Regions:
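Catalytic helix-loop patch of NAD(P)-dependent Rossmann-fold dehydrogenases
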Residues: 15, 51-90
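Conserved Rossmann-fold NAD(P)-dependent oxidoreductase catalytic core, especially the SDR/UDP-sugar
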Residues: 21-65
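Glycine-rich "substrate-gating" loop/helix at the edge of Rossmann-like oxidoreductase active sites
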Residues: 62-67, 94-101, 121-131
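Alpha-helical substrate-binding/gating segment
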Residues: 108-116, 124-158
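Mid/C-terminal beta-alpha module of Rossmann-like enzyme folds, strongest
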Residues: 144-192, 225-231
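C-terminal amphipathic/interface module of NAD(P)-dependent oxidoreductases
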Residues: 195-231
Length: 231
């Protein structure tokens, strides 16, 4: 969705999730069956693609931009299932770092060619999480009967794009000294989707930590070494 065609991919996914949730709710009402929990995916885009002094928590409302509205609609459809008396958990996921695909694949390209540099201003925050941690959080949400409502799934601490890109270069043993890659280049390549890399909010994971979750990869260096180094 992040790097697909927003005019079709995201809209199709939006409708698909809402329609699927509606079908699930209708079927549950028809059969009278009630699962022990309903776990739904959302994103930190719920808070909007902004860089500011604010640190967002689960109590903050949705942004009015495109992605914020998409996330709001996803969550609304999930809570309609929760209205049936089913424990409902919403996982607001940050940028998932994984070995292949996704945002990290785009981020490492400059470093691979020895031209590591920030993307755009470099001041934008990156609310990230390692793939292993997000999977573990979903498992916890299924098993932990005390969990309900929204949870931010982002690694502890806050890092901006310049810091993350420099860490990528260091982990890969590449230089990091080139001027920032201009924002307009990403806008030319990805259009509106470029906001995923060029903007970002600080998002607090304190609620999931208070629930008892301990991050396997709490800092970008350990996460990137796991993902980018040969084992």
């Amino acid at each position: 969705i992040v790097f697909g065609d927003w005019s079709s991919d995201v809209c199709s996914s939006d409708l698909s999730r809402i329609n699927t949730a509606g079908h699930i709710k209708a079927r549950l009402k028809e059969t009278g069956k009630r699962p022990s929990a309903f776990i739904s995916a959302s994103g930190t885009g719920y808070y909007g693609s902004v860089t500011s002094d604010r640190i967002f928590t689960e109590s903050d409302g949705p942004a009015t931009d495109f992605i914020g509205e998409v996330c709001r609609r996803w969550e609304k459809s999930a809570y309609e299932i929760g209205n049936l008396g089913i424990r409902t958990v919403i996982i607001r996921t940050g940028i998932v770092l994984t070995k292949s695909g996704g945002a990290l694949e785009r981020m490492v390209l400059p470093a691979r060619f020895g031209i590591g540099s920030p993307l755009g201003s470099g001041r934008q925050y990156v609310p990230w999480i390692h793939i292993d941690d997000i999977c573990s959080i979903y498992i916890k949400a299924i098993e932990d009967k005390e969990m309900h409502g929204p949870y931010n799934a982002t690694a502890p601490g806050h890092i901006n794009n310049r810091q993350l890109m420099e860490t990528i270069s260091v982990v890969m043993g590449r230089p990091f000294f080139f001027p920032a890659i201009p924002s307009f280049m990403f806008k030319m390549l990805y259009g509106e989707r470029s906001s995923i890399l060029l903007n970002g909010s600080r998002v607090s994971p304190e609620l999931i930590i208070k629930s008892g979750y301990s991050f396997k990869y709490p800092d970008p260096e350990s996460a990137l070494k796991n993902l980018l180094c040969q084992h």
